[in-house]
Every structure is written in structure tokens, then in C-alpha cells.
Amino acid sequence: MQGFRLVGGTALALQYGHRQSVDLDFFGTPAVPQEDIIDMLSSLGSIVVHNRTDKILQVVLRGIKVDVIDYSRYSWIDNPVMEEGLTLASPKDIAAMKINAVEGRGSRKDFIDIYMLLQHYTLGELLDFYQKKYPNYSFFRALLSLTYFDDAESQAMPKMFISQTWDEMKSYISNKVKGYNR
């Protein structure tokens, strides 16, 4: 979709291959009216529109949840990654968005993705990406949220393609945060 990037867990899983992800989140600046996006998605198969506002379109397309979000109020901090004809958000942008997501809801999948990002970047770099993307958001709150796993504990583990356990990932993230605070 022109003007959009695939973001979130699916985009990261396509780049790192660490877990299964079953939804599609497209963020960007719409180049066409929302009605044209619906028509384009309908051409791919049967869709059901679940939510539609000026900025958000949420549908189920052939059993797959697809979100199309007008993200024009935020800047991209890195160039997109092209993968098999798809325009993906870069790991740097995804890192910033994942920290923001953990700050808001703390899902298990988001923590798993942060664990994977920490295999490629330092915690300081992840936090720098977050601050660059969301300069008016609370750095301290973001840092605290990285060790608040309570909401994620009751959630199912996604199908994983790496050997680390949930407890190992939590411990790894916690140790990185403790080390950062020293």
C-alpha cells in the first residue's frame, strides 16, 4: 500500500525470524482516500470492517486482522526496509514503537520483540530511538515499563522460532535495565 509501512511484530518477525505473528499493521500517510484502501483490500478477498474512523481502519481480511493507521503525526526515524516487495518499518522505528506499546499495555509479544531488538542494539540505543520518535513522551516511564511484566504473565506464548524461554527473556531485559540504571 503506497505511503504505508508494515510495522509491529509481523514486520520484526519478517526481519528477525524469531516468532510467528498473525496480524498486519500498516502505518503511514495515506496517499488515497480510505474508501480506495477498502476497495483494494476487498480485491484480495472477503473483508469485514470492524472499526473505521478518520485515522484508523481495522478489518479482517480472509481471517487475518489488518489495521491501517494514519501515522502522519509522527516522523519515521529511519528508512524503510524492503523485503520481498513489502515496505517494512526499520528495526529502529519498530523499537521505538515497541517501547511505546509496552509503556501502554505490556503484552508478552511486545516484550519478546524487545528481547530480540536487544540482540541487535543496546538498551541505550533503543531508548534513543524512542526519544527521537516520541520526543514529548516520558523517558522515565518508558524505562520503568520495560520491567513491568505483570500484564503479560497471563498471556499465551506465541509460536517461537528461537529457544529462549519467557523467563529467560524477562531476566535478560531486567538485567539490561538494571545495568543501564547504574
Can you annotate each of these PLM segments?
Residues 1-182:
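Compositionally biased terminal segments of proteins
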